[in-house]
Curated annotation (Swiss-Prot):
Organism: Staphylococcus epidermidis (strain ATCC 35984 / DSM 28319 / BCRC 17069 / CCUG 31568 / BM 3577 / RP62A)
GO CC terms of this entry: cytoplasm
Subcellular location: Cytoplasm
Protein name (database record): Ribosomal RNA large subunit methyltransferase H
PANTHER family reported in the protein's UniProt record: METHYLTRANSFERASE (PTHR33603), RIBOSOMAL RNA LARGE SUBUNIT METHYLTRANSFERASE H (PTHR33603:SF1)
NCBIfam families, per database record: PRK00103.1-3, PRK00103.1-4, tRNA_RlmH_YbeA
Superkingdom, natural source: Bacteria
Length: 159
């Protein structure tokens, strides 16, 4: 089993990197995890809708170029389906039972994901109707993946 977290932009702050490293270590016994960052598109602060779409398209192509054809793609979207921690564990378990073993979670940049990435998605997942910084979202996501594995194995952690 392999899980990839694919995201736009570079993780900059040391504390986010440390949190990610901790969960990568914790996930070691359960799955191979890889974090891939694609560069975010430099853009002015006040963009037109057309400029926003162009930024999303460029970032989207970078993301799509990193997704393996056989990978099950789970995009993080505000309009996606909200799951509990148990629900995420069940969703992953169901897909693994169906023979899926390569998962790519995709986190877009500050303007969201391009339509081409959304069309490649096998599952749209939402953590909230609120917007989170995409650097923070990586930490939240990797923690929830770890929690899902603990739930699937019936191990103490989730309360």
């Amino acid at each position: 089993m392999k899980i990839t977290i694919l995201s736009v932009g570079k993780l900059k702050e040391k504390y986010w990197k440390q949190a990610i490293a901790e969960y990568e270590k914790r996930l070691g016994p359960y799955t191979k995890i890889e974090l891939i960052e694609v560069p975010d598109e430099k853009a002015p602060e006040n963009m037109s809708d057309k400029e926003i779409e162009q930024v999303k398209e460029k970032e989207g192509q970078r993301l799509l170029n990193k997704i393996k054809p056989q990978s099950t793609v789970i995009t993080l979207e505000i309009k996606g389906k909200m799951l509990s921690s148990e629900g995420l564990a069940k969703e992953l378990q169901t897909r693994m039972t169906q023979g899926q073993s390569d998962f790519t979670f995709v986190i877009g940049g500050s303007n969201g994901l391009h339509q081409d990435v959304l069309q490649r998605s096998n599952y749209a997942l939402s953590f909230s109707n609120m917007t989170f910084p995409h650097q923070m979202m990586r930490v939240i996501l990797i923690e929830q993946i770890y929690r899902a594995f603990k739930i699937m194995r019936g191990e103490a952690y989730h309360k």
